[in-house]
Amino acid sequence: MVKTQILGRQIIKVKHVSVKEFEANPSMIWDYDVMMHGTWDANADNVLNDNAVNEIAKYIDAGKGVLAGHDSVGFSMGTTLGLSKIADKFNIKRGLWNNAIQNGYDINNS
């Protein structure tokens, strides 16, 4: 039995790119509908540089998709590192971790 392919469906192509490679050429994301960043716990302390974050912000503004790992926005990144700089684009409220304010936002008092 041959499955009929419907254009734009059932096609998932994944290309693994290192953080260094992405930072050197962040415009590569425009070749894809969705980009993903941050699969390791605490993202293995890989923080994207400002050039990469700015390109991702434009990508989101253009309606493209970004899937971010749970520690790549917030946690120890605060509001000044990596994707946390554009956390508002993800509609994420960041809060407390082990009773220590990581980023100046107390979710319990919002």
Could you describe each region identified by the protein language model?
Residues 1-41, 77, 96-98:
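Aromatic-Pro/Gly-enriched surface loop or interdomain linker
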Residues 41-110:
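A glycine-rich, often tryptophan-bearing local segment used as a flexible ligand/cofactor-contacting loop or short
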